[in-house]
């Protein structure tokens, strides 16, 4: 019995139409044979049997699939000693040692680094100015050119840019801000030399590219002497150091001028410090209080400055846990480590603070401050009364 009689009839009509058409060849396309489909109805018994077979197959699959823990144990047993990786504890210790070594290198690097402030931004723009700057800090003496200190690297910081671009892109494109004409630099020398202090003293306050340089050491910066310095307030945020050099230059020789700036925007905060070489210059500088200052920047208006003495706030000198005062070498390591190390490492630093060339003593580990109650004096009034009371109680 044919299940699809209509499909066969339609196929015959289509074949006759294509035979008469001119587009196709005379050969007719063969007819597709239609397979017979037999529909078998399953009884309830057959359905129950199929369900049982599926349940049995699923049970077999559950039994055959091993757990992840068993697979992991088998893999461990089959691994040869060559395939077993190294212990993670050793790798962590090696990582800690490498971090310590890099941080110690940074502390050692700071001892041969000097800071140069109020530097003209022409050093970044002009190659000839950069070469002159490099030559200035290479030579120890102006008379003897053979005495040189080799420079390892020069880094420029506090550079203000005009556009909001990435700093590297703006630096390459030389898009510097017009109102900020000075930058800071860090010069790293290849070797640590005692002649660096001589170089710092000679170049501090020297004029380079129409600006007074401020040269100082990183590890042992020059102390801020409150008696030889004055506080200057009511400054414009865009004020420059050269304006203060010119304004206070008549009072006496100036050691350095420092305008306090915002670390992110490099704009001034409205106040500065001027330190003189002589104490008598401070009294002359105080006479300039409430007097207007002519700015080097032409677009800035005259402002009346507030000139006062610096407050003499005493700072407690750092000491070790043994109570002893630290040496210059220990202060160097502690001062730089505060910026390089994190909070946990800084807390351990005083325990492990060692400097090469210093011999350890027996009393280094003994703390001066003892915990608990204070010991009673043996010859005091309280002890005498207590001893007399005990004797009177024994007689009774």
Curated annotation (Swiss-Prot):
- UniProt biased composition (Acidic residues): 47-58
Q: Name one GO cellular component term.
A: preribosome
Q: What is its main location?
A: nucleus
Q: Where is region (Disordered) located?
A: 43-104, 361-396
Task: Report the superkingdom from the record.
Answer: Eukaryota
User: Compositional bias (Basic residues) at which positions?
Assistant: 64-73, 368-396
The alphabetical list of record keywords is: Nucleus, Repeat, Ribosome biogenesis, RNA-binding, rRNA processing
**One BP annotation, GO:** maturation of LSU-rRNA from tricistronic rRNA transcript (SSU-rRNA, 5.8S rRNA, LSU-rRNA)
Q: Where is the composition biased (Basic and acidic residues)?
A: 87-104
Xref: PROSITE patterns = RRM
Q: Which GO terms describe its molecular function?
A: rRNA binding
Q: Where is the RRM domain?
A: 112-220, 228-312
Instruction: Fetch the SUPFAM superfamilies from UniProt.
Output: RNA-binding domain, RBD
Q: Where in the cell is it found?
A: Nucleus, Nucleolus
Which intervals of the chain form a coiled coil? none
Q: Which family does it belong to?
A: Belongs to the RRM RBM34 family.
What task does this protein carry out? Involved in pre-25S rRNA processing.
Kindly provide the name given to this protein in its UniProt entry: Nucleolar protein 12
Q: Which organism is it from?
A: Candida glabrata (strain ATCC 2001 / BCRC 20586 / JCM 3761 / NBRC 0622 / NRRL Y-65 / CBS 138) (Yeast)
């Amino acid at each position: 019995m044919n299940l699809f009689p209509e499909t066969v009839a339609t196929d015959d009509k289509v074949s006759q139409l294509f035979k008469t058409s001119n587009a196709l060849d005379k050969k007719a396309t063969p007819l597709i044979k239609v397979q017979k489909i037999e529909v078998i109805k399953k009884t309830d018994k057959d359905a129950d049997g199929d369900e049982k077979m599926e349940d049995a197959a699923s049970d077999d699959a559950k039994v055959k699939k091993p757990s992840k823990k068993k697979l992991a144990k088998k893999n461990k047993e089959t691994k040869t000693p060559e395939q077993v990786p190294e212990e993670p504890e050793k790798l962590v210790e090696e990582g800690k040692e490498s971090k310590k070594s890099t941080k110690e290198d940074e502390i050692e690097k700071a001892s041969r680094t000097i800071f140069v402030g109020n530097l003209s931004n022409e050093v970044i723009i002009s190659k000839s100015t950069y070469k002159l700057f490099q030559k200035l800090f290479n030579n120890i003496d102006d008379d003897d050119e053979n005495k040189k200190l080799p420079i390892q690297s020069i880094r420029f910081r506090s550079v203000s840019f005009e556009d909001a671009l990435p700093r590297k892109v703006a630096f390459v494109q030389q898009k510097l801000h017009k109102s900020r004409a000075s930058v800071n630099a860090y010069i790293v020398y290849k070797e640590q030399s005692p002649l660096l202090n001589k170089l710092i003293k000679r170049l501090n306050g020297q004029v380079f590219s129409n600006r007074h340089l401020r040269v100082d050491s990183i590890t042992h910066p020059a102390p801020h002497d409150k008696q030889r310095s004055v506080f200057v307030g009511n400054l414009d945020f865009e004020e420059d150091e050269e304006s203060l050099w010119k304004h206070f230059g008549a009072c006496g020789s100036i050691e350095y001028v420092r305008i306090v700036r915002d670390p992110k925007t490099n704009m001034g905060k409205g106040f500065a410090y001027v330190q003189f070489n002589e104490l008598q210059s401070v009294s002359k500088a105080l006479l300039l209080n409430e007097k207007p200052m002519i700015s080097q920047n032409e677009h800035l208006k005259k402002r009346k400055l507030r000139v006062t003495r610096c407050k003499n706030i005493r700072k407690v000198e750092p000491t070790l846990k043994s109570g002893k005062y630290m040496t210059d070498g220990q202060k160097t390591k502690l001062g730089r480590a505060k910026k390089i190390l994190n909070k946990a490492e800084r807390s351990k630093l005083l325990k492990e603070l060692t400097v090469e060339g210093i011999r350890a003593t027996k009393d280094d580990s003994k703390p001066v401050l003892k915990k608990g109650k204070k010991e009673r004096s043996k010859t005091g009034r309280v002890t005498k009364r207590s001893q007399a009371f005990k004797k009177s109680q024994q007689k009774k």
